[in-house]
Amino acid sequence: SYVDAPIIAERLQDTDIAVVNKTPITKQTLDACPHLKLICVLATGYNVVDCACAKEKGIPVCNVPAYGTASVSQFAIALLLELCHHIGHHSETAHAGRWANNADWCYWDYPMVELAGKTIGIIGFGRIGQATGRIAAALGMHVLAHSPHESDEGRRIGTYVDLDTLLRESDVISLHCPLTKDNAELINRQTIAKMKDGALLVNNARGQLLNEQDVADALNSGKLAGAALDVVSAEPVHADNPLLS
């Protein structure tokens, strides 16, 4: 397995350069790889590497910070539009005959959500967060942003606010922050309680940013009207993940 520490160490123990993506490079692995001189992460996020340990050993860690800016932001909006229009559901049920058997000319199982005039709160306002904000603004949305670093370009796209304000005022919350030890399970029972009733959640950053049981509970109770996620805490997704039930 690509996450099995002994196998990773065995594969890397005689190498000078490790090129990885989802493979965790832990202290245990680094201790077992005395020849390692460079770690290249084929992703923007580099949370799979114990960077503190790598630094102690003098091993540089490289990532690819801008390879997916356009595609990831586009997909975030695609996930949001799916929540608003349930396109997949209506395609599937129309093919199953639901529209053909409908008494009215208009077949729709869910009300549509119009985004113009609504507020999107973007947590993490780097390249991808800002690109997502530009698309949201083009759809007529108001953009709020929360980020440890502010920029003039960010201010042209949206308004920087503290996290509590963003949670309280946003109709849609989209996550675009890196995963750190400080923000693991950022979206949990307490932060969800601060959100608007019926808020929508989008996450194509890192699955560990969510407490998945708390998000599932919020979806089942109706506190969250929907969540569109293409990342989970363990990938491939486990069959017992609460978000699947």
PLM feature segments, named:
Residues F125-G126:
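Glycine-rich Rossmann-fold phosphate-binding loop(s) that bind the pyrophosphate
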Residues L36, A116-T119, R189, G198:
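Phosphate-coordination loops involved in phosphoryl transfer and adenosine-cofactor binding
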Residues N21, L42, L79, H176-L179, ...:
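Short, well-ordered coil/turn residues at beta-beta hairpins
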Residues S1-C62, R168, N188:
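An N-terminal-biased, well-structured beta-alpha scaffold segment characteristic
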Residues K57, P65-T119:
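Phosphate-binding beta-alpha-beta segment of Rossmann-like dinucleotide-binding domains, i.e.
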Residues G129-Q130:
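N-terminal Rossmann-fold NAD(P) dinucleotide-binding loop
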Residues T26-L30, H142-L144, P148-P242:
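Rossmann-like adenosine-cofactor binding region
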Residues T119, G133, M141-H142:
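Residues at the starts of beta-strands that form the adenosine-phosphate
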